[in-house]
Amino acid sequence: MEKRKHDQVLLITGASSGIGAETARMAAAEGYRLALVARNEEKLRELVTELGEDTTLALPCDVADWDAQRQAVDLAHQRFGRIDAVFANAGFSKGSPFYGGPDKPIEWKEMVLTNVYGAAATARITLPELVKTRGHFLITGSVVGHITSTKNLYSATKWAVTAIAQSIRNEMVGSGVRVTLIEPGVVDTPFWGTVPKPGTPELSAADIARSVLFAMDQPPHVDINTMLIRPVGQPH
């Protein structure tokens, strides 16, 4: 693949595995310099070693910690001098019915803080940098940010992400910043480590990463606002 983006910087949250890691690999192949944010420092540093320390920066960080995110973005700017694109991809799911079963207040709070507050904080902290570069803000939602998924607070957090993406797009009109909501269906990633798979067809993390790069590779005047990506045969 031709390296076309050697001067551009992409910051990815949730970068240590799954969609985030595959997006980092594909972006590196296109020549992006990478600032990679994740809680799992060991996996993050393994990925940086794989992709090359000259062009990739590990930023261990919990996106639910505002100050830690601010510091991570500052370090990325100090290292690379600019940020051209941000992929707010951090998020997870836990079994979360609203009725029946044991109470899980800590899990609920952690999920809302990561999926909603963390994503909003990523936007708030990075958008000033993207205005400078007329850059691109991408955020991971979900197919369940469009439909009602039973027994699932996670679905409610992704409805919130859908609203966040639309609000950011409206705010950034006239700034030159593009905004893209990536909405995967069922994807085979470590996401399913804590919840049962639905037993339907699956996409790979690479399928979603290709979609992210497709949106980023459009001409500056083309703003792909929403990409809903399901595997063929997924029933919902």
Where are each of the predicted segments found?
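Conserved glycine-rich cofactor-binding loop
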Residues: 16-17
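Active-site helix of classical SDR
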Residues: 123, 157-158
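C-terminal helical subdomain
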Residues: 174-177, 181-182, 197-236
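The beta1-alpha1 cofactor-binding region of Rossmann-like NAD(H)/NADP(H)-dependent oxidoreductases
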Residues: 41-42, 60-72, 105
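Conserved glycine-rich Rossmann-like NAD(P)H-binding loop of the short-chain dehydrogenase/reductase
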Residues: 30-47
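Residue(s) in the substrate-gating loop at a strand-loop-helix junction
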Residues: 142
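Conserved mid-core segment of classical short-chain dehydrogenase/reductases
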Residues: 93-109
